[in-house]
Each structure stands twice: as structure tokens, then as C-alpha cells.
């Protein structure tokens, strides 16, 4: 017969509790073969017989302070029809006999120690020497003579006590788990300001995932662990490889040693996951930057991504006599651990050289009459000066590339410059407008191209090429200059910085609003011939040879 400690009254966590059990009267009586004899029937009675006092029962109390939970020995003492098992002033069970029927009842009062920690439902038996505890049947005939017989109840495991183990389970409602680190760290070369080197799943949030119970044996301990299934487990994350077109490097794989899981690739450690086995707190520590595939967002995040059950956080509940039970939550399949990107920085230098490029119409190719020594149909914003306008940084993901472009807002954009029209009183012709095709912006009017602006996308050098002369309104100065003049932001030079995993950032300087590109005039030339004169002015080609007063 057995009782089971999984009782609500004892704090049991199981559902199979049994508070009392009996050796039935029928079974007890069937152990014997009495006869009254010639004097006829008198009576039959039953009793328990315990030899001695404070008799060791082979059972023990539970002591949470002891490593294996084994407490004081439970001893037996008898008073009348009741034998009580007790230790340290606490009663653990009773054996009671009905003296008339022989029924014996085992009543469980408190839980006892069970040494088998591999089975939370194991049983231990009351264990005494042969003949120490017996059940006695006494037969009395009609004139009072009596005889007795006994069966042993202590040496054969008659009375058993089944264990109650702890319960480990998940809470019905629990806070979500999440930890995010950010690569924008000085230690990683990051340029952002929101870097996060480590993040945790707090002990409180971890513990709130579970609903443990120690059961009837009382509190032992609760511990936590990470469980990774396999070695070199693909994490769904990648290293950064500047040599790859999209920057995606080798797969980062996971391996566990004790309480630490490390994500690594090619001999480089990228992050660790560490658990505090006492509290359950899990810390994600970022050691190096990982690849992010979204090139449209320099602050996107990627998640550690594993199959269901590959990475779990385990809570193990151990009761006072060493039985344990475990429950687990998944940490790999739900985007719990995230890694935010660091993008490049594009900005302007605090101090930079001024930008300017001037061409001069006093060119033979344009019929110029001037003799400017430095006349040229081409002028450049040098690569060095252009690059000095900016202050780029690649950030934690490392160097990708730097490129340059011209950006013109709109089409047929008024340049502030004009063609020359000899038919107009002041020579001002049609407005020269700007249009862009690729790396070239062309200024044209009436089907005639007057100049081009061309950028070298690799170096940033911008070349102004003069194709035809433009109108100059200052008639008092034959060598005056006019500037390309646009609204702020209409024509800009853009530097685009791209890091190793494809994120990009841009900065720009204005080229249209600050007189960067200038066009110097060519004036007429006066020749003295026979007391008279003639003049030539490229801005008035119809008047290339006019007589003037002698």
C-alpha cells in the first residue's frame, strides 16, 4: 500500500496525491487461518506490535539545508493502536489498526525524504528488521483460552511513500523578451551617437516567463541555463566583407562553452550571450559589427535567427530532496536578440578652401580679340579642393566607397546667363538654360550649347568647358565677368559615402548660388590705320569690322 505526497495540503505540485491508504480488513484476515477448538467460538482481535521505542524506520525527514536534502531519521513509537513516525518533534505518518477488523490505515502527515533525484515520483518504504513490526491476530475460545499468530509488516516494503516533485512550467502571461545592441560605438569606429555595447534580458523579465512550484518537499533551488543544440550553429547573421559586392561576408556560427555562447566567423568573435545561472539574466555583448542587408536604412536591425528550439533559456526547479523539473522558452526563433546598424557619415568640413572656376572668351576659337595670357576654354574645381569641402566617415562597417555627383533640380533651369544677340540694343539674347544628362550639365539657348559642367564621379573634379561666348552687360569693362547664378540648392555637388555593407549617406555643397563658375568677357580691339580706326567685338559678331571716327 502507498501514500503519495502530491497533496495540496502539503504544498504538492503533482496531481496524484494520496493522503491515506489501508490494508483492508479482508486482506488482513486472509493472512490467517484461525480455529476456536472444542470450546467453541469466543473472539478474534487484531493489534500492531512494535518492538522497542524510537525504532529507526528507514525513512528520513527533508532538510533543505543539507546538500542532498536528507534530514533526521524518522523513528517509530507506539501508543495503543497507533504507531507514529516522527523526527524533531514533527509527526510524519501514523499507522492505526482497527482491533476488531484488522484494517490498518497509513496516514501521511508530512513529506519524507526520497533519495532518487532522477525520478520525481519514486517511492521509499518503511524498512525495519524482521519481526520488529508485526500485525498480530489473537484468537480466544469460549472459555477464554487464546492463541496468536503474526505477519511481518516492516521487512517487506508493505508501507510505501511516493514522492512529489517540483513543477516547472511557463507563465500564462509574460512580458516579451528583447535585447538590442547598436554598432554606433567609438570602440568599433562607429559614427552614430546611439551605440549600445551590451543589452540584457533582465532577471525580472526572465523569471516572469515561468511558473515554478517546489512541491511538497519544499524549496530547494532554481537555476537558469542557456541550451544550444549542436555546434557551429548558423545564426542567420553574417560578417562584413568589404570585398563582396553587397558586403555580405562569412556566416556567423554559434558555439557554447558553459554559460557563454559565442557568435564567430573566420576566427573573429562578433558577440556573446552570457547567462547568470542564479538569476537568469542574459547579457548580449557586441564585440564586432555584423552585416546588414538593408542599404536603404543605415540604422536598420538584424536578428539572431534560429530554428524553433535550437536556442532556449531553461529554468530548472529543484526541490529540497533533489528532484528537479525544467521548462524552457525559445530565444532563437522570435527575434529576441537584435543588432542595429551603424551607417557612414557625410558632412561638410569646418574649414574648406573656396571653390571657383573661370573661363575667358578671349580665345581664338571663339574669334576673341583679347590677349589674356591665361585665357582658357576650360577651368576646373580640382579634386583636392572638392574633397576638402567634406568630412566623411565610413563608420563601424568599414570602408566601402566615396562617389561624387552633380545634382540639378529641374530641367530648362534658368542659369542667369544669356546668349549674345546682335539684333538686340544691348546685345542680350535668349536666356541660357541648364539641363543634366548623367555627369554632364549643359547650358544652352536656341539650340546652341554655350558651356558644360562635367564631374568626375570618382574624384569629384568638376570641369567648366566654354563652347560659345555669353552676354556681358557691363559695357564699361571689356574684361568683366558674369557668374552662373541659381537659387540656393538648385545646383549642388554631392559626396556620397558608402560603407562596407552598402549603407550610404550624402552631403552637398552649393555650386549655383555663390558665383562659383564665372565667364570673363572679351572686348573689341582698336587698330590705327591711316588716321582712322576699326574695332571688333566678339559679343557683336555682326560688327566685327566697324569704321570709327578719324
Report the location of each language-model feature.
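Acidic/polar, solvent-exposed loop/turn segments
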Residues: 1-550
